């Protein structure tokens, strides 16, 4: 890892349909092998399915799902004299968002519905109602942090 200077953050353009930067980041995470148009059709298809099922604005359901999945605290390994401790630390906002997006997509890919569009819409709906594997993942991370609260004084 280079120690010179941190790479500058690239600007992410808002998506064409909703004008939302987070949707673009989500789309980029869904994308495989540079196939943006495929990722776009999956994400927009999932959001359209959500709108058809719930009769709500799909963007609010998406934002609620992401909010319910983003972790507030996580554990990081810290070596202190021969022993490795799992130290709970707060998660900064950019990492919270990245983890939330990643967990939502991983949970959606692990579902049993037929198409990725259906899987993604089902996982987003579950997450917006505080259910599903992505929310379970966040709960597990929070439990782990809670269990290791005794080591929080090793924070750096």
Curated annotation (Swiss-Prot):
CDD domains: uS7_Bacteria
GO CC terms of this entry: small ribosomal subunit
Ribonucleoprotein found in the keyword field: yes
Biological process, per Gene Ontology: translation
Gene Ontology MF term list: rRNA binding; structural constituent of ribosome; tRNA binding
Alphabetical keyword list: Ribonucleoprotein, Ribosomal protein, RNA-binding, rRNA-binding, tRNA-binding
Record text on subunit structure and interactions: Part of the 30S ribosomal subunit. Contacts proteins S9 and S11.
UniProt function note: One of the primary rRNA binding proteins, it binds directly to 16S rRNA where it nucleates assembly of the head domain of the 30S subunit. Is located at the subunit interface close to the decoding center, probably blocks exit of the E-site tRNA.
HAMAP family, sorted: Ribosomal_uS7_B
Family label: Belongs to the universal ribosomal protein uS7 family.
UniProt-recorded name of the protein: Small ribosomal subunit protein uS7
């Amino acid at each position: 890892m280079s120690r010179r200077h941190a790479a500058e953050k690239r600007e992410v353009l808002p998506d064409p349909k909703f004008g939302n930067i987070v949707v673009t980041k989500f789309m980029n995470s869904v994308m495989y092998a540079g196939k943006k148009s495929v990722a776009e059709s999956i994400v927009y298809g999932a959001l359209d399915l959500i709108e058809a099922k719930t009769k709500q604005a799909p963007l609010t359901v998406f934002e609620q799902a992401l909010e319910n999945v983003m972790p507030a605290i996580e554990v990081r390994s810290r070596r202190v004299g021969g022993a490795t401790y799992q130290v709970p630390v707060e998660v900064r906002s950019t990492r919270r968002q990245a983890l939330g997006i990643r967990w939502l997509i991983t949970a959606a890919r692990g579902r049993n519905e037929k198409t990725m569009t259906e899987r993604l819409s089902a996982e987003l709906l579950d997450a917006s109602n505080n259910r599903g594997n992505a929310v379970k993942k966040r709960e597990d991370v929070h439990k782990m942090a809670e269990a290791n609260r005794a080591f929080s004084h090793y924070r750096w």
